[in-house]
């Protein structure tokens, strides 16, 4: 039993979205913050690291690498106010808490879509590739991931003067777009199949309607391609 190319492509796109979503979540590069004293740090959903500028030139003889050569990172969690720092702590805390929740829900939804695809390949009755609910379940999961990522990303439309968005945020935007594309491909495939199969499986042709036009017609029905 072959799987449609559109479905396989959509699942592959969703898999890339899942990888990008997790990469954006666990890298401390969601935003950059600059303090008044000139120090800078990168803040992610779960980590915040100080950006240490190494002095130019080679170290002297016998010098040992100190703490300044290592990124000083701290873990962040739910309700952490350390992400705000010089910005409004309440606003930044809400932004990161919302994004953490949306990121986790999107990860679960994308993983559920991948699991649905794998279970369908095993030949389960309710999730077989011939059943429409198989594609609809995957489309719903990918659309949910896209929806919650949009909600989380919208919270960062306004940031403080000491903060600038970094590449992890744009990586998550790419994950959101790919999840939307995967859902759109599956929805298009489901609607296209329904348009092809809107007619009943058996079309009954009355003899009285066709007798005057085709005298030699002996068939009582014609099967549709669906």
UniProtKB/Swiss-Prot annotation:
Origin superkingdom: Eukaryota
Transmembrane parts of this sequence: 6-26, 104-124, 137-157, 171-191
Keyword list, A-Z: Cell junction, Cell membrane, Membrane, Transmembrane, Transmembrane helix
Gene3D superfamilies for this protein: 1.20.140.150
GO biological process: lymph vessel development; regulation of vascular endothelial growth factor receptor signaling pathway; smooth muscle cell differentiation
Signal peptide boundaries: none
Protein name: Transmembrane protein 204
Gene source species: Bos taurus
Gene name of this polypeptide: TMEM204
């Amino acid at each position: 039993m072959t799987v449609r190319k559109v479905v396989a492509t959509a699942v592959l796109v969703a898999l890339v979205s899942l990888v990008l979503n997790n990469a954006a979540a666990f890298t401390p590069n969601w935003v950059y913050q600059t303090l008044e004293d000139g120090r800078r740090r990168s803040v992610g959903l779960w980590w915040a690291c100080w950006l240490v500028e190494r002095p130019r030139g080679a170290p002297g003889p016998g010098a040992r690498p100190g703490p300044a050569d290592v990124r000083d990172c701290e873990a962040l969690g739910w309700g952490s106010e350390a992400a705000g720092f010089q910005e409004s702590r309440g606003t930044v805390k809400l932004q990161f808490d919302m994004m953490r929740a949306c990121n986790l829900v999107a990860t679960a939804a994308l993983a559920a879509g991948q699991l649905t695809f794998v279970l369908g390949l095993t030949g389960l009755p309710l999730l077989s590739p011939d059943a429409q609910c198989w594609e609809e379940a995957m489309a719903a999961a990918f659309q949910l991931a896209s929806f919650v990522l949009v909600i989380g990303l919208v919270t960062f439309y306004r940031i403080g003067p000491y903060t600038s968005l970094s590449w992890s945020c744009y990586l998550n935007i790419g994950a959101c777009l790919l999840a939307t594309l995967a859902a759109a491909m599956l929805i298009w495939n489901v609607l296209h199949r329904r348009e092809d199969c809107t007619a009943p499986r058996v079309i009954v042709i009355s003899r009285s309607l066709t007798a005057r036009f085709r005298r030699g017609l002996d068939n009582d029905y014609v099967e549709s391609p669906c």
